[in-house]
Amino acid sequence: MSRFPAVAGRAPRRQEEGERPVELQEERPSAVRIADREEKGCTSQEGGTTPTFPIQKQRKKLIQAVRDNSFLIVTGNTGSGKTTQLPKYLYEAGFSQHGMIGVTQPRKVAAISVAQRVAEEMKCTLGSKVGYQVRFDDCSSKETAIKYMTDGCLLKHILGDPNLNKFSVIILDEAHERTLTTDILFGLLKKLFQDKSPNRKEHLKVVVMSATMELAKLSAFFGNCPIFDIPGRLYPVREKFCNLIGPRDRENTAYIQAIVKVTMDIHLNEMAGDILVFLTGQFEIEKSCELLFQMAESVDYDYDVQDTTLDGLLILPCYGSMTTDQQRRIFLPPPPGIRKCVISTNISATSLTIDGIRYVVDGGFVKQLNHNPRLGLDILEVVPISKSEALQRSGRAGRTASGKCFRIYSKDFWNQCMPDHVIPEIKRTSLTSVVLTLKCLAIHDVIRFPYLDPPNERLILEALKQLYQCDAIDRSGHVTRLGLSMVEFPLPPHLTCAVIRAASLDCEDLLLPIAAMLSVENVFIRPVDPEYQKEAEQKHRELAAKAGGFNDFATLAVIFEQCKSSGAPASWCQKHWIHWRCLFSAFRVEAQLRELIRKLKQQSDFPRETFEGPKHEVLRRCLCAGYFKNVARRSVGRTFCTMDGRGSPVHIHPSSALHEQETKLEWIIFHEVLVTTKVYARIVCPIRYEWVRDLLPKLHELNAHDLSSVARREMRDDARRKWTNKENVKQLKDGISKEVLKKMQRRNDDKSISDARARFLERKQQRIQDHSDTLKETG
């Protein structure tokens, strides 16, 4: 488990021999030193005072601009104060008298941390005047006037309040990230004003905030609304291309050693100032923390470091699945003489602002969800960042003083491999969940919905087909009663379908823990240290064996139940190398799902079924009801082929309990695929063909165009055009035939025949005369 945060320096607490690092361990040098500093009266940005921001000079103009316009775009550099200060200004100007001020964030970490910050500045308890709502966690009340939330939570709110009557202002923050949900919110808000609904509040205002984006395009989308620019206060940032990655290394992400070396060089050779390092995910971050700590431990601060005021390096990881307390540590100032180094995902590029950063190390890559048309699935891939994202990252080094950005890639990599802007998520991921939401909002024409960037029609049709396969829509593309129930669940439609099937069999207790575990991040800790890695793998194998050793879904259920019943869940997780924070989240998810199922089963028309058979078979049958699209059959050796019509080859992931048991299997279902050197199926269980025999035809029985009312209308129009053209041709042919007939009739009467004979004889007589004249001339 991670030992970080930790300080490597002159006098850190060394790990005892044989001691294993403990997750969430509080007795660490960094935490103790920071706490001591707070007790001595040193304050930080988190301490309840409002720092100065460039936005403060624009306060009056900005408030007036919001009053004067239904839509307003606010732009400014990251750190200008848009996220924390504008909602406060609007609250103090009285906007909350007509409803809440809602502020969306793409990530739950940002929604929570910003709400905490604003509550401290306004000197109120979090959940009172200032609150937040993220998936599975609603910290708000009737008193709440400023509500930070994920964009997904606002989309769910619109299902019950389509006209947003509870809000006076909607602020869509971080619009430049172009998440799928934010793009759908763009369209819904535009449609709300276009339709001129009589129930819409007159006072509703929409503010779109972005650090970097195609602003003219966004303004045109919202009816050429004004753009309010907040002048920035960024200091100059010098950029250096380290040339460690070139265009040929586009697929190569094995750059951890290089990044650690660059980071260590900064610590040794640059003057005071904190460091921010960008990597793609938790595994890379924890590995980098370990390597950097090992290097920093060997530094002699009397001779090796150029800045003699430095005594150590405080190493702090930052990624989405960390607890709130762990995330808060990155905002605290380091102890005197200690340089802070935050190693983070892309979340620190825009969503979080960390004071004191003067050096940025840009790894050049990000994890991105992309739709793989060959597999028909969304794949989480590591891809090069865009140029706009790279500029966002470098800007973090120039907030409080001049800084430096070290890009590990080359200038050629920048020019050849990095797109100018982020590719909108709506153009590269599955649209199944949002299409269902639009259908439930009575928006049936999902193809002609007002998208800022229209997605590929193929993605829309594929989403419709998947919803039909889950019985969420009927053959006409209209949402079913089941679809209306499914949209309430914070799960993907196929997993919701499996849960509802289990509820109809009165065995939801078997599936709810699994659904909850699949809703959180990977629960298994896989340490970098080889010794701990072996111990963790052994513990994970033991857990799989308790589930029968042949079903990864069942293993998740065993982990859930054993941890919950242990009496000391955090200690149980520590012993078994399981992320306690993920299990804690799963417990909350399971409770919410159980309440939704309870309400669903109270409906008089809820279907009831019976099944006589062992529990493990019932569980797998219910999984088949939702995952039959992810069915694969063994073909050759250890390779399986999907049965969705593509026949894509997949392999069982090495982390699965079924790995190296492939020859014993015939049919499997899987939760997701990962693409590395091969296409791997992850979280797998064996099934029987007869369980999916009646379900598989649904993958092929209907053309996706049949589910789209637009496609049907266009096909009808096309058919009408073809019929009209056919009739015109027929009429033309008929007209030609009548004309020909008249000519034939005219030619065949007696007068026509005698006239034709006379003309023939006349021409013959003329030829004879001409021939006679020629002979006379030659003679």
UniProtKB/Swiss-Prot annotation:
The keyword Hydrolase applies. Pfam families: DEAD (PF00270), HA2_C (PF21010), HA2_N (PF04408), Helicase_C (PF00271), OB_NTP_bind (PF07717). GO terms for molecular function: 3'-5' RNA helicase activity; ATP binding; ATP hydrolysis activity; RNA binding. This is Probable ATP-dependent RNA helicase DHX40. GO terms for cellular component: spliceosomal complex. Residues 63-231 form the Helicase ATP-binding domain. SMART domains: DEXDc (SM00487), HA2 (SM00847), HELICc (SM00490). ATP binds at residues 76-83. Residues 13-41 have a biased composition (Basic and acidic residues). Its EC number is 3.6.4.13. Keywords: ATP-binding, Helicase, Hydrolase, Nucleotide-binding. PROSITE patterns: DEAH_ATP_HELICASE, HELICASE_ATP_BIND_1, HELICASE_CTER. Residues 42-53 have a biased composition (Polar residues). Residues 1-53 are annotated as: Disordered. Residues 263-442 form the Helicase C-terminal domain. The lineage of its organism: Eukaryota, Metazoa, Chordata, Craniata, Vertebrata. Probable ATP-dependent RNA helicase. Belongs to the DEAD box helicase family. DEAH subfamily. Gene3D superfamilies: 1.20.120.1080, P-loop containing nucleotide triphosphate hydrolases. The gene is Dhx40. It catalyses: ATP + H2O = ADP + phosphate + H(+). One of its GO terms (biological process) is mRNA splicing, via spliceosome. It comes from Rattus norvegicus.
